[in-house]
């Protein structure tokens, strides 16, 4: 059963679309940021801005930022420095910093880069029009206060017309000791199921074929929504949402990310096995293969629990692909604990792993711990990890050799104009000829049967067979 929050706020934009100049958005970081950028681009176009041909000729430049690692944050300051110099000769330029760096730094960003016009945290993305109107009135604006995220009826300007990101839950209530996300993205706010369904139905009408449901911890979806069944089970879970949206006509594939092992239930796995549109790919970060490290990270599960989740997925969906995230050189991690992480990667056999050496982030407990590891150890462990991850990914991809897979064509291969590129249901990037048997020509948006002839660690190449 699906229930909704009565206090949901919605808003339509009424600003006339007069020509306000051009805009450019640069996005750093995660899928959530990419989805936010698409939404903000839609707002700007509804206001009368047009996308610029290049960043250097834009009248409004917006950086949607990430602070999960220090190097991502420093890159933002490098970009801002160039725009600050440009603004001295182009005073009409509007300069905006959005996202997690904006939320973390707030007014201190204005002191560091006084040329900024607007600093806005991720909870304020849907307020962009109102905030820019304040800038037009001569104000320098900082919007980082905790805020109820508005349902935004303005159509996002999607980077693709085939695959779409759909935010279903904002924020994070976890307290991982290394992570800055809860302090910059705020508390969990689940969207109403009906609003999510309406957005996906609209995407289907526009010809989109695939949606990816997004959340920092997507399987925590609905914890803040009302609804308890007669059996005492919480309603409005991610599982309920998947059943609720599954039969929307026109949508061929459904994905979701990112999952937290603490909330990944057997019922969710069973639903994914039952519902044919759910793709056989699961992104479930494990972060460390050592229980003591997981405990110090504040992750709330053991590696044994993580293994049980993977075992259940492979029991019900043997051909599923599993991707993950891992951090090495966490404060106090010794060599044996690092080896436990490598052991898990070998034994589980991940299709892909996003890797990182631990990075101290402000306002996180682990940043102040005494057991920080030397940079040389971080570099060595990350290098060893990456070599293993690449070899494991290539080994996993061998199962596709000479196999026929379904690929959703997403666009032209930028390195080979004679090829299309897309993804399998298991999320393998695949390249194939635009021309099939009997000189049939395939186009983006087509579901194509492809026989795989070449494998690499992170991609496949083949030929259409139909």
Curated annotation (Swiss-Prot):
Residues 398-466 form the TRAM domain. It catalyses: N(6)-dimethylallyladenosine(37) in tRNA + (sulfur carrier)-SH + AH2 + 2 S-adenosyl-L-methionine = 2-methylsulfanyl-N(6)-dimethylallyladenosine(37) in tRNA + (sulfur carrier)-H + 5'-deoxyadenosine + L-methionine + A + S-adenosyl-L-homocysteine + 2 H(+). Transmembrane segments: none annotated. One of its GO terms (biological process) is tRNA methylthiolation. The keyword Iron-sulfur applies. It comes from the Bacteria. Keywords: 4Fe-4S, Cytoplasm, Iron, Iron-sulfur, Metal-binding, S-adenosyl-L-methionine, Transferase, tRNA processing. Its cofactor is [4Fe-4S] cluster. [4Fe-4S] cluster 1 binds at residues 30, 66, 100. Gene3D superfamilies: 3.30.750.200, 3.30.750.210, Methylthiotransferase, N-terminal domain. It is an enzyme of class 2 (transferase). InterPro entries: Elp3/MiaA/NifB-like_rSAM (IPR006638), Methylthiotransferase (IPR005839), Methylthiotransferase_CS (IPR020612), Methylthiotransferase_N (IPR013848), Methylthiotransferase_N_sf (IPR038135), MiaB_methiolase (IPR006463), rSAM (IPR007197), TRAM_dom (IPR002792). GO terms for cellular component: cytoplasm. Residues 21-137 form the MTTase N-terminal domain. Binds 2 [4Fe-4S] clusters. One cluster is coordinated with 3 cysteines and an exchangeable S-adenosyl-L-methionine. PANTHER family: CDK5 REGULATORY SUBUNIT-ASSOCIATED PROTEIN 1 (PTHR43020), MITOCHONDRIAL TRNA METHYLTHIOTRANSFERASE CDK5RAP1 (PTHR43020:SF2). NCBIfam families: miaB-methiolase, MiaB/RimO family radical SAM methylthiotransferase. Monomer. Belongs to the methylthiotransferase family. MiaB subfamily. This is tRNA-2-methylthio-N(6)-dimethylallyladenosine synthase. The lineage of its organism: Bacteria, Bacillati, Cyanobacteriota, Cyanophyceae, Synechococcales.
């Amino acid at each position: 059963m699906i229930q909704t929050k009565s206090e949901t706020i919605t808003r339509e934009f009424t600003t006339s679309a007069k020509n306000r100049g051009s805009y450019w958005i640069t996005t750093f970081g995660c899928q959530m940021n990419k989805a936010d950028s698409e939404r903000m681009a839609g707002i700007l176009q509804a206001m009368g801005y047009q996308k610029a041909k290049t960043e250097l000729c834009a009248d409004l430049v917006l950086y949607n930022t990430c602070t999960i690692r220090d190097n991502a944050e420093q890159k933002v300051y490098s970009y801002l420095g160039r725009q600050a110099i440009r603004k001295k000769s182009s005073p009409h330029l509007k300069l905006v910093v959005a996202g997690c760096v904006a939320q973390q730094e707030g007014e201190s960003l204005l002191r560091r880069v006084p040329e900024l016009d607007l600093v806005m945290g991720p909870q304020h993305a849907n307020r962009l029009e109102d905030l820019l109107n304040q800038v037009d009135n001569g104000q320098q604006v900082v919007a980082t206060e905790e805020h109820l995220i508005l349902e935004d009826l303005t159509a996002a300007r999607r980077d693709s017309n085939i695959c779409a990101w759909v935010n279903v839950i904002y924020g994070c209530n976890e307290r991982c000791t290394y992570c800055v996300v809860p302090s910059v993205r705020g508390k969990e706010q689940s969207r109403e199921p009906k609003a999510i369904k309406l957005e996906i139905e609209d995407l289907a009408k526009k010809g989109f074929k695939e949606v990816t449901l997004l959340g920092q911890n997507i399987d925590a979806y609905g914890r803040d929504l009302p609804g308890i069944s007669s059996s005492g089970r919480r309603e409005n879970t991610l599982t309920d949402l998947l059943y609720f949206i599954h039969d929307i006509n026109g949508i061929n594939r459904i994905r979701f990310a990112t999952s937290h092992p603490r909330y990944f239930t057997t019922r969710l796995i069973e639903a994914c096995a039952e519902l044919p549109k759910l793709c056989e790919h699961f992104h479930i970060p494990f972060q460390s293969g050592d229980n003591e490290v997981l405990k110090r990270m504040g992750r709330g599960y053991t590696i044994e629990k993580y293994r049980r989740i993977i075992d259940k997925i492979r029991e019900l969906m043997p051909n599923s692909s599993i991707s993950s995230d891992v951090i090495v050189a966490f404060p106090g991690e010794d060599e044996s604990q690092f080896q436990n992480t490598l052991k898990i990667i070998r034994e589980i056999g991940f299709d892909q792993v996003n890797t990182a050496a631990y990075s101290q982030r402000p306002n996180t407990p682990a940043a102040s711990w005494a057991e920080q590891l030397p940079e040389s150890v971080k570099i060595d462990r990350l290098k060893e990890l990456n070599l293993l991850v690449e070899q494991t990914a290539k080994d996993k991809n061998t199962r596709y050799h000479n196999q026929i897979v379904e690929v959703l064509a997403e666009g032209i291969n930028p390195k080979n104009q004679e090829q299309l590129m897309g993804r399998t249901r298991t999320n393998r990037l695949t390249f194939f000829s635009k021309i099939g048997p009997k000189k049939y020509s395939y186009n983006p948006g087509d579901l194509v049967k492809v026989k795989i002839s070449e494998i690499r660690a992170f991609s496949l190449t083949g030929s259409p067979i139909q």
